[in-house]
């Protein structure tokens, strides 16, 4: 009887240890994911995502893919800041905005300016193309090049949707952003309350 009790007790102890270990492992993995997929600049992202009717998770996905949240990064193609905006694109976007202030390219190092104009660009592209993936192609490769791809039957059968992305860099970029997007949606709940963005961990 006593021996049977010891066996049952041992089995229960093993189960508890396994459950605790699994829970600890799950918590550790979650913490690691949140470190890799952070939420920063909530006030700025919330304001601009709300103004341009964007999913904050997508904005964060683009920022992570473009700059890994480094404010002062400059690419070898001359793209600046968090959302990696080039000077010609920045100048063009300023003609589409109603801002009273005229900015210089150095202002793209400022998160509030970079995110504002990056969100404006995303909004324009999402309104122009039929899918998020095609809009992201244009964000990376430019609207002119995407227009050429859509006109080519080798890449688009209907002139609206790309079934093949001919540039490996752009293909990898779109895949990275969409993966980021999925993870941000899984990790966080973005809630609008009185026009203010609230971020909660799921």
What are these regions (language model features)?
Residues 6-24:
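Hydrophobic membrane-insertion alpha-helices, especially the h-region
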Residues 1-3:
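N-terminal Lys/Arg-rich, disordered targeting/topogenic segments
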């Amino acid at each position: 009887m006593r021996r049977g009790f010891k066996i049952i007790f041992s089995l229960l102890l093993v189960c508890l240890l396994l459950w605790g270990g699994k829970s600890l492992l799950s918590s550790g993995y979650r913490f690691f994911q949140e470190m890799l997929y952070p939420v920063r600049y909530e006030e700025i992202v919330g304001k601009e995502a709300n103004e341009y009717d964007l999913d904050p998770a997508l904005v964060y996905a683009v920022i992570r893919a473009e700059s890994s949240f480094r404010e002062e990064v400059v690419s070898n193609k001359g793209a600046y800041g968090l959302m990696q905006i080039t000077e010609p694109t920045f100048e063009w976007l300023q003609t589409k905005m109603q801002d009273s202030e005229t900015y210089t390219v150095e202002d793209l190092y400022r998160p509030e300016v970079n995110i504002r104009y990056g969100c404006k660009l995303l909004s324009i592209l999402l309104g122009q193309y039929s899918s998020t993936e095609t809009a992201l192609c244009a964000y990376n490769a430019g609207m002119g090049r995407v227009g050429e791809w859509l006109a080519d039957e080798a890449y688009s059968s209907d002139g609206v949707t790309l079934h093949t992305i001919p540039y490996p860099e752009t293909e990898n970029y779109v895949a990275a952003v969409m993966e980021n997007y999925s993870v941000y949606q899984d990790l966080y709940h973005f809630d609008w309350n009185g026009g203010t963005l609230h971020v909660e961990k799921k």
